[in-house]
From Swiss-Prot:
GO terms for molecular function: alpha-1,2-mannosyltransferase activity. It comes from the Eukaryota. Pfam families: Glyco_transf_22. Alpha-1,2-mannosyltransferase that catalyzes the transfer of the third mannose, via an alpha-1,2 bond, from a dolichol-phosphate-mannose (Dol-P-Man) to an alpha-D-Man-(1->6)-2-PEtn-alpha-D-Man-(1->4)-alpha-D-GlcN-(1->6)-(1-radyl,2-acyl-sn-glycero-3-phospho)-2-acyl-inositol intermediate to generate an alpha-D-Man-(1->2)-alpha-D-Man-(1->6)-2-PEtn-alpha-D-Man-(1->4)-alpha-D-GlcN-(1->6)-(1-radyl,2-acyl-sn-glycero-3-phospho)-2-acyl-inositol (also termed H6) and participates in the nineth step of the glycosylphosphatidylinositol-anchor biosynthesis. Pathway: Glycolipid biosynthesis; glycosylphosphatidylinositol-anchor biosynthesis. Disulfide bonds: none annotated. Glycans are attached at residues 15, 176, 467. GO terms for biological process: GPI anchor biosynthetic process. This is GPI alpha-1,2-mannosyltransferase 3. The gene is pigb. It is found in: Endoplasmic reticulum membrane.
Length: 536
């Protein structure tokens, strides 16, 4: 009997030990929750990231590419206020209204509360983009926190926040910016090998939103979705319960929005891929050699992180393979297209930062030195490109804005921009119905070999174009806006027609081709002179 009792006690104690092991695992998860509240300079990491991105938004005061205005804010302004310029893409139906609709809702709210000032119309959408980027950064940190070690998560977050290209782009109203944020958020719910936070519904919904906003997001996500399909146990259910309903719903809602605003049934995503991929219309705006992304694109976008990213790739294990393959695949596919831009591969930058985090976490003796060098070498290009390079395109609109006071007068100002097409924003940064004209540059869609757009015709012989376009002084605009590189060539026209320089605004230290160092504003009539306080 005593032996039986002894055995019962031993059994009881062994059961208690099992329960203790379970409690131990709960303690580990509690530690994870504590790690998520990591503090930087005494500030919660989430709050810190938000503050960094808001500061980022304030310290980016330059222009990058025309699309950040002409394919978003300009269209939103037209949707709400009834005036704004539509480029050829909107006339051909290759742009969707889902993205501009987002800013149009903000504009409408500002209009309803009578706060639709130029400053808020420009700044509110950029704050939204900065907050979206901050949310994506926080989610990326939390993904790596549970997928890797806390050290890797911390350094991945550091790499992401100090990336000069992310700093330069994340607060801009570009479809590429939103595509990158949605791609990062989708990755946080993607079934990565060993991940604990995956949700097919969530990641596929975010991917579908990215595709609606920018159809080329499919390029980034094709290998990831294919990998998910190959590794999933129930492929039929994945197709019928995930891929099909989410894809159909997203495309259906997008088609309804686009058809409503276009006034006819239209499938924008197909038109976008047809023009940009199949017909390669983008080549009209410039072409690059096949290796450009490998030799220039990726090295510039990754920037000073490049050595650490390459080191991280060497340290990567099997579970990182799908991310590495996605970077290679995306770069290779975009390399097949003639027209190439840095922003096109922006969505793979967060993937690269994961490998950078792996590298810094592995470095022990050199970690502080590497992190310091990374911060310094990113800070310089981030501040220069954000505050100095190509700032004149925005500053000139600020200088011209006082002319809006006379927009409703019997003899309102008329402005002519003698610059490469879409060099500056338009009505979205003036917010008044002034009569504006600029040199247009739509591509030839008819296949003519001798085609020249209006901008090319003008720059081939500026004086001839001006004299034939304005044979009478009465037809001349009241103001001309041009780069200083054009000034000498049309100086005789300016003198003959009594144009006087009213403002000179710095634009860039690196003038190239038709783009000059400064932007000049000329006026014909003294009563139209711009306040001298605005002259830069």
């Amino acid at each position: 009997m005593e032996k039986i009792r002894e055995r019962f006690k031993q059994s009881k104690s062994s059961n208690e030990s099992v329960r203790l092991r379970k409690r131990s695992s709960i303690l580990y998860s509690t530690d994870d929750r504590k790690l998520q509240t990591l503090k930087i300079f005494g500030i919660n990491i989430t709050v810190f990231i938000v503050l960094v991105r808001l500061l980022n938004c304030v310290l980016v005061q330059t222009s990058f590419v025309p699309d950040e205005f002409w394919q978003s804010l300009e269209i939103s302004h037209r949707m709400v206020f009834g005036y704004g310029y539509e480029t050829w893409e909107w006339k051909e139906g290759i742009r969707g209204y889902s993205y501009p609709l987002l800013f149009a809702l903000m504009y409408k709210l500002l209009q309803l509360i009578s706060y639709d000032t130029v400053y808020l119309l420009v700044f509110v959408p950029r704050v939204f983009q900065a907050l979206l980027a901050a949310y994506a950064d926080v989610k990326l940190y939390k993904l790596i926190l549970q997928w890797e070690t806390p050290d890797v998560a911390k350094w991945t977050c550091f790499c992401q926040l100090c990336s000069w290209f992310a700093w330069f782009c994340c607060s801009r109203t570009l479809t590429n910016t939103t595509e990158t944020a949605l791609t990062t958020l989708a990755l946080c719910f993607y079934p990565l090998p060993g991940s604990k936070t995956h949700s097919s519904w969530k990641y596929l919904t975010l991917v579908s939103l990215a595709v609606v906003i920018r159809p080329t997001a499919l390029i980034v996500w094709f290998p990831l979705i294919f990998y998910h399909f190959c590794t999933d146990q129930d492929k039929l259910k994945l197709i019928t319960h995930r891929y099909f309903p989410i894809g159909v719903l997203a495309l259906g809602v997008s088609t309804l929005i686009d058809s409503f605003f276009y006034g006819k049934w239209i499938f924008v995503q197909w038109n976008f891929l047809k023009f940009n991929v199949l017909h390669n219309v983008g080549e009209f705006y410039g072409s690059h050699p096949w290796h450009w992304y490998w030799t220039q694109g990726l090295p510039v976008v990754i920037g000073p992180h490049l050595p650490l990213v390459l080191h991280g790739c060497l340290l990567s294990t099997r579970k990182h393979t799908i991310l590495l393959l996605t970077i290679i695949w995306t770069t290779a596919v975009y390399s097949l297209l003639a027209h190439k831009e840095f922003r096109f591969i922006y969505p793979v930058l967060p993937f690269c930062m994961i490998f950078c985090g792996l590298s810094l976490a592995k470095l022990q003796a050199w970690r502080k030195a590497a992190a310091g060098a990374l911060l310094l070498f990113n800070l310089c290009p981030a501040l220069y490109t954000g505050l100095v390079h190509q700032r004149g395109a925005l500053d000139v609109m600020h200088v011209l804005q006082p002319l809006c006071v006379s927009s409703q007068s019997p003899n309102p100002p008329e402005l002519l921009f003698l610059m490469p097409c879409h060099s500056t924003p338009l009505y979205s940064h003036l917010h008044c119905p002034l009569k504006l004209r600029f040199l247009e540059c739509p591509p030839d869609l008819t296949g003519r070999q001798d085609y020249m757009d209006e901008a090319d015709v003008f720059f081939s012989d500026p004086l001839h174009w001006l004299n034939t376009s304005f044979p009478l002084r009465s037809t001349l605009p009241s103001h001309l806006v041009l780069f200083d590189s054009l000034q000498k060539e049309i100086s005789s026209f300016l003198e003959e027609n009594s144009f006087a320089k009213q403002a000179e605004i710095f634009h860039t230290h690196f003038p190239e081709g038709r783009v000059g160092k400064n932007i000049l504003i000329y006026s014909r009539r003294s009563e139209m002179k711009i306040n001298e306080g605005f002259i830069l």
